[in-house]
Amino acid sequence: MNAPLERPANSVDPKLLEILVCPMTKGPLEYDAARQELISRSAKLAYPIRDGIPIMLPEEARKID
């Protein structure tokens, strides 16, 4: 039997990234692995990822240019 694939502790499940959208615009998100953020270009917000869990609250998001 094959062992489940282990992901690094700070990574996000790729399947989750496929279904998540910006809660403000319902638009697509871009994953920034270096900063551990999900970027919404349309809302100009960066949602943090903490311990591999995306924090999809607009009040927790960082404004971007």
From Swiss-Prot:
Entry protein name: UPF0434 protein BRADO0313
HAMAP family the record matches: UPF0434
InterPro entries linked: Trm112-like
GO cellular component: cytosol
PANTHER family from the UniProt entry: PROTEIN PREY, MITOCHONDRIAL, ZGC:162634
Protein family membership: Belongs to the UPF0434 family.
Organism from which the protein derives: Bradyrhizobium sp. (strain ORS 278)
